[in-house]
Amino acid sequence: MNILLSIAITTGILSGIWGWGAVSLGLLSWAGFLGCTAYFACPQGGFKGLLISACTLLSGMVWALVIIHGSALAPHLEIVSYVLTGIVAFLMCIQAKQLLLSFVPGTFIGACATFAGQGDWRLVLPSLALGLIFGYAMKNSGLWLASRREQHSANTAVTK
């Protein structure tokens, strides 16, 4: 069984579980899938990738709240929102000099989830966090399944 098929199987199973779990817990299922996406897209794998993804998602949420609350200070001057968005977008990219904030797409995913969740960080945060953990489980259980299948095939070939 190849790696892609193994990851597809575990992702399919765990996606169904996540969909049910998110609804049962009153979380945003779509935000959870953004958390999954962040882990899958992060160039680092394993625990390091999980940590980097978590830090960038969280920083994106904070930056989105800066834009939301900063824009609210001058609601009748739309230009303030545009300038603030430009400055924050610059900072979201430049922060990638730091290893734990080096996954720029994760930062933007966290910000977009916060905007889509209308700034309700108390709902967005656990949705993203659990989704991120599910993404970690999806990919790593798929890799485990593929390696187990490969070991089984190798053992079968040796005994023949």
Curated annotation (Swiss-Prot):
Protein name: Inner membrane protein YcdZ
Transmembrane segments: 20-42, 50-70, 72-92, 99-119, 123-143
Location relative to the cell: Cell inner membrane
Chief location bin: membrane
Topology with respect to the bilayer: Multi-pass membrane protein
Pfam families membership: DUF1097
Domain of life: Bacteria
Gene Ontology cellular component list: plasma membrane
Keyword annotations: Cell inner membrane, Cell membrane, Membrane, Transmembrane, Transmembrane helix
Sequence similarity: To E.coli YahC.
Annotated gene: ycdZ
InterPro entries associated with the record: DUF1097
